[in-house]
């Protein structure tokens, strides 16, 4: 299978792309090189090789849900740079 300039023109129109004539020839050559490489992969003997669905086994990386005591207001505000009563005090943002 090979790609022609007509094929590249059609694909470019679908993708709403515009190429000059030299770019069309470059794209045609590059696509043909890619297809040639893929055809070489078809020549590889894969008899007896198990198909892979992915490289890594899925692993649950979440920790167990453990109920902890909530922090008190004073513990939460302990390191606050500025506070007012039980609230964080921040600089005025909107005029």
From Swiss-Prot:
Reaction(s) catalysed by this chain's protein: L-glutamyl-tRNA(Gln) + L-glutamine + ATP + H2O = L-glutaminyl-tRNA(Gln) + L-glutamate + ADP + phosphate + H(+); L-aspartyl-tRNA(Asn) + L-glutamine + ATP + H2O = L-asparaginyl-tRNA(Asn) + L-glutamate + ADP + phosphate + 2 H(+)
Enzyme class: ligase
EC number, as in UniProt: 6.3.5.-
Keywords: ATP-binding, Ligase, Nucleotide-binding, Protein biosynthesis
Gene Ontology biological process terms from the UniProt entry: glutaminyl-tRNAGln biosynthesis via transamidation; regulation of translational fidelity; translation
GO molecular function, one term: ATP binding
One Pfam assignment: GatC
Top-level division of the source organism's lineage: Bacteria
Protein family: Belongs to the GatC family.
Assembly description: Heterotrimer of A, B and C subunits.
Summary of the function given for this chain in its UniProt record: Allows the formation of correctly charged Asn-tRNA(Asn) or Gln-tRNA(Gln) through the transamidation of misacylated Asp-tRNA(Asn) or Glu-tRNA(Gln) in organisms which lack either or both of asparaginyl-tRNA or glutaminyl-tRNA synthetases. The reaction takes place in the presence of glutamine and ATP through an activated phospho-Asp-tRNA(Asn) or phospho-Glu-tRNA(Gln).
Protein's name in the database: Aspartyl/glutamyl-tRNA(Asn/Gln) amidotransferase subunit C
Organism, scientific name: Chlorobium chlorochromatii (strain CaD3)
């Amino acid at each position: 299978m090979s790609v022609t300039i007509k094929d590249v023109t059609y694909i470019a129109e679908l993708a709403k792309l515009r190429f000059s004539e030299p770019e069309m020839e470059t794209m045609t050559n590059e696509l043909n090189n890619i297809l040639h490489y893929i055809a070489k992969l078809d020549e590889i003997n894969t008899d007896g090789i198990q198909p892979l669905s992915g490289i890594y086994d899925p692993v649950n990386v979440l920790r167990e849900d453990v109920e902890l005591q909530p922090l008190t207001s004073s513990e939460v505000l302990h390191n606050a740079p500025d506070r007012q009563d039980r609230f964080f005090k921040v600089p005025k943002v909107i005029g």
